[in-house]
Amino acid sequence: MATPEEVAYEKFLERVRRTVYVDELTPLATAPVISSAFNQFGTVKKVSFIPNYLGPKELPMGVLVEMENEEMTQAVISTVSQLPFMVAGMPRPVRACAAEPNMFVDKPKKPGRTVRFRWIKPNDPDFDKARRVKRLARKHSAENSFMLKKQLEEAEKLSKQQAETAVTHHKKFEMMDKLLYDGVAQKLAGRYDLKGFPYR
């Protein structure tokens, strides 16, 4: 017979299998927006935001979307990985993958697992390993901050490029509207003997 800890952990694993991790989401997205975006794949039970502790607020964030069953979760993952899926007007599509147990804040303790710790003395054989791990953690932190900086620069560059493109297209459409409303296009059509001018 299973212990209460094992039953709780099994329920948690079932919840993990029903959950999708969505990344590259704009910080302006809210829970109702995300729910309505993913309700087209099935019923959304819960939306949990994963805060970004490592960088500024402008960075894209992640969210855990719990669906009603595993089939809906697989539908979300397959559709979002094959086709671009935009949420809340973000200029780039979001990414989706299956959630993992360590992504949850309320993860229960694994049954039968105990955490042990001890102080290591400098003459201990594991002391050198611990120092190397500590150095490696610092190196990873520096690499991570560098990558976050580069990611922000790329996002800003992409945003400027898209803004310039939008302004250019808007000017073109304004010029076309002006030509049509002023009658210049009709005069040119008459001049070049084009019949059946579609506008006006």
UniProtKB/Swiss-Prot annotation:
Presence of the UniProt keyword Cell membrane in the record: no
Keyword Nucleus found: yes
Record's function text: Prevents gene silencing by suppressing CHG methylation as well as histone H3 lysine 9 dimethylation (H3K9me2) status at target loci. Collaboratively with ASI1 and EDM2, the AAE complex regulates alternative RNA processing (e.g. alternative splicing) and epigenetic silencing (e.g. H3K9me2) of intronic heterochromatin-containing genes as well as genic heterochromatin-containing genes by promoting distal 3' polyadenylation, thus being required for the accumulation of their full-length transcripts. May also modulate transposable elements (TE) expression.
MF annotations from Gene Ontology: RNA binding
Record's protein name: ASI1-immunoprecipitated protein 1
UniProt note: phenotype after gene disruption: Hyper-dimethylation of histone H3 lysine 9 (H3K9me2) in several genes. Impeded use of distal polyadenylation sites at intronic heterochromatin (HC)-containing genes (e.g. histone demethylase gene IBM1) resulting in a lack of functional full-length transcripts. Silencing of transgenes such as 35S-SUC2 and genome-wide CHG hypermethylation at gene body regions, leading to reduced transcription of several genes (e.g. IBM1). Abolished expression of At4g16870, a transposable element (TE) of Copia-like retrotransposon origin, associated with methylated status.
GO biological process: chromatin organization; defense response; epigenetic regulation of gene expression; positive regulation of defense response to oomycetes; regulation of post-transcriptional gene silencing; RNA processing
SUPFAM superfamilies, per database record: RNA-binding domain, RBD (SSF54928)
GO CC annotation terms, alphabetical: nucleus; protein-containing complex
InterPro entries reported in the protein's UniProt record: Epigenetic_reg_gene_expr, Nucleotide-bd_a/b_plait_sf, RBD_domain_sf
Occurrences of domain RRM (ranges): 18-101
PANTHER family linked: RNA-BINDING (RRM/RBD/RNP MOTIFS) FAMILY PROTEIN, RNA-BINDING (RRM_RBD_RNP MOTIFS) FAMILY PROTEIN
Keyword entries, A-Z: Nucleus, Plant defense, RNA-binding
The protein's assembly and partners: Component of the ASI1-AIPP1-EDM2 (AAE) RNA regulatory complex composed of at least AIPP1/EDM3, ASI1 and EDM2 and may contain CPL2, AIPP2 and AIPP3/BDT1. Binds directly to ASI1 and EDM2 and may function as a bridge protein between them. Co-associates with EDM2 to histone H3 lysine 9 dimethylation (H3K9me2)-marked chromatin and transcripts at a critical proximal polyadenylation site of RPP7 to hamper proximal transcript polyadeylation/termination.
